Amino acid sequence: MIVQDTNDNEPKFEKEFYEIDVDESLPKDSQIVPLNARDLDKGKNGRLTYTIIDRDPGVEDYIGVLPSSGIMFLKKQLDREEITSLSMTVRVQDQGLPQLSDTARVKLNIVDVNDNKPVFTAASYSFSVVENIAADSVIGVVTARDGDTGRNGEILYSIKSDSGKFRIDNPSGRTRNTSLSTKNSPQVIVQHWGPEKSGLQGSWPLINLVKF
């Protein structure tokens, strides 16, 4: 007597919902996660195939799944500044008759990396000050922008060189004088540094302080 296996067990994903953080710096063809499923049947009744059946716009361009293993991979590199997350439904199906299947929802959160330098909103600034301006007066404001998010987009300002005559407030970019008089400084050139907290440095605009 030969006992044949009948297709009486559905394939089952380990989880109904997968939420995965994906670093935007991962290169094309990187493996993201294996979507493991089990089927207790034997032979073709337990042979599984994985497909993406429902997806957000853009998923097809970026995400693929290996049919025989369920491993998700990148078709091309992600960019957190363009896409913040991708959601899809993955189906696993056996090869029996009738075919049995299961589905799982997958959400990929794109994690920002520090790939944008801060940029000042102007190449140079000119601020006019009176000769005997009071110490710690606000003489002007500089601003910078950064395309990254979270901590990677937080900007800290510092003064690169000015002989100790000025300081700059964070995170406002307000520039202040530290001494009462500018008598011997008909023109002072100050360079500001705008690095992000995580270390990428921006450009240094010139700031001309003209006494009147």
Stretch-by-stretch model annotation:
Residues M1-F212:
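Extracellular cadherin-type adhesion modules in metazoan precursor proteins
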